[in-house]
Regions:
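Alpha-helical scaffold segments that flank or form the walls of functional sites
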Residues: 26-39
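Short, histidine-centered active-site or binding-site loop motifs used for metal coordination
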Residues: 10-11, 143, 173
Length: 173
């Protein structure tokens, strides 16, 4: 049987309840629990582009935030992004991409990025994924509202995604 890799995203998902404003001691305790459970792939938060309103630290999951944590070297650290934050008038916003991910993966504590997208933005999401792959990040695609997809759309997506090296595809109901 192949090895199964889980993505632990409790902290990122829990941020919907407190706007991603977690106390550092809680996050470090969470990391210790993840280590004891031998969880390797941790999606710690979002990485939203700059915003008019401040959300908690893990809405942005900056490099300085990651450097301040007790991260085990065995952890693969990930963030989630919303594809729509990087698309302006059906074009990718290169400035937003470069502002939000200023470093190559080799100079970042982030190993993987999960791109949440609606099917209408799928082409641009794959293009965004390729741009981030070119920076050395591992990429996963998270298709939202998958219950609305039919077999034809899923087959079209399968064809489109053949040209990009995705780590995983996640269909969110």
């Amino acid at each position: 049987m192949k090895n199964i890799n889980f993505i632990e995203c409790t902290l990122r998902d829990g941020g919907y309840h407190n706007l991603w404003d977690f106390d550092k001691s809680l996050v470090n305790e969470y990391l210790q629990v993840c280590k004891s459970l031998e969880l390797k792939n941790l999606e710690l938060g979002f990485r939203f582009p700059k915003s008019e309103e401040w959300l908690g630290e893990y809405a942005y999951t900056s490099e300085s935030t990651l450097e301040s944590l007790s991260l085990d070297d065995d952890f693969n650290i990930g963030v989630m992004i919303n594809a729509s934050d990087f698309i302006d008038e059906e074009q990718l916003n290169t400035a937003t991409i470069n502002y939000t991910f200023p470093f190559e993966a080799s100079n970042s504590r982030i190993d993987f990025i999960r791109i949440a997208t609606h099917i209408k933005d799928l082409n641009k999401s794959l293009e965004l994924g390729q741009r981030l792959l070119d920076k050395g990040y591992k990429i996963a695609i998270n298709i939202m509202q998958a219950h609305n997809l039919n077999k034809k759309v899923i087959n079209e997506f399968s064809q489109l995604s053949k040209d990009i090296e995705l780590q995983s595809i996640y269909f969110a109901y």
